């Protein structure tokens, strides 16, 4: 049970790994943390691993990914979050498969201008070994890379329940959360 008296059973969410992906400002962290709170499943993001284990160097980045991938492999339910693309995407997929428990992959898709506006308001600094490009450039680029990874990896894996969930730019967190909770509760 969580602080709101809800449990994974009450939410009708079977034990599974739930990977939330999306570009900067898409609401991944907000939705994933709320889902973790309401299910009792542990939450892990690559950014949290970077903060905890990284130091802004390549070694720190590798160390952060080692921890994130170990959690992907672990045969236990969890709520996971990263953008869903990049050089480690195939390792994430492979390690999720190694966990041998059901996996739902949910891509949060919002209008890019909404994501740019949200990401531009952030103050949080994440240790990362490469310089960040301006948000207005990064958001569409990341979206395009996720699109490629979605078509070539996430939606093609038959052992994953993969859902591309699109929202309007005015969708509230509650609307997004309700849709994600429904996806995770659905029988495969």
Model-derived segments and their meaning:
Residues 2-11:
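Pre-Walker A adenine-sensing motif
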Residues 20:
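Hydrophobic anchor at the beta1->P-loop junction of P-loop NTPases
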Residues 24:
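The conserved Walker
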Residues 99-122:
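Conserved phosphate-donor/acceptor-positioning beta-strand/loop module used by diverse small-molecule
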Residues 78-83:
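Structural recognition of the conserved hydrophobic beta-strand(s) that form the central parallel beta-sheet
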Residues 27:
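Conserved glycine(s) of the Walker
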Residues 30-76:
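Conserved substrate/cofactor phosphate-moiety recognition/catalytic segment
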Residues 125-183, 187-188:
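Small-molecule kinase domains that catalyze NTP-dependent phosphoryl transfer to phosphate-bearing small molecules
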């Amino acid at each position: 049970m969580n602080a709101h008296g809800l449990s994974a059973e009450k939410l009708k969410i079977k034990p599974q790994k739930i990977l939330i992906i999306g570009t900067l400002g898409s609401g991944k962290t907000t939705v994933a943390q709320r889902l973790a709170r309401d299910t009792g499943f542990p939450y892990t993001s690559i950014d949290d691993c970077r903060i905890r284990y990284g130091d802004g160097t390549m070694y720190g980045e590798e160390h952060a990914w080692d921890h994130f991938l170990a959690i992907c492999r672990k045969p236990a339910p969890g709520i996971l979050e990263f953008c869903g693309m990049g050089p480690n995407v195939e390792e994430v997929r492979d390690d999720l498969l190694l966990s041998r428990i059901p996996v739902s992959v949910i891509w949060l898709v919002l209008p890019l201008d909404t994501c740019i506006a949200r990401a531009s308001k952030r103050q949080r600094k994440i240790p990362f070994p490469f310089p960040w490009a301006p948000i207005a450039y990064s958001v569409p680029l990341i979206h395009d890379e996720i699109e490629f990874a979605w078509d070539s990896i996430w939606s093609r894996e038959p052992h994953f329940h993969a859902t591309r969930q699109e929202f309007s730019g005015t969708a509230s967190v509650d609307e997004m959360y309700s849709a994600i909770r429904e996806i995770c509760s659905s029988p495969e």
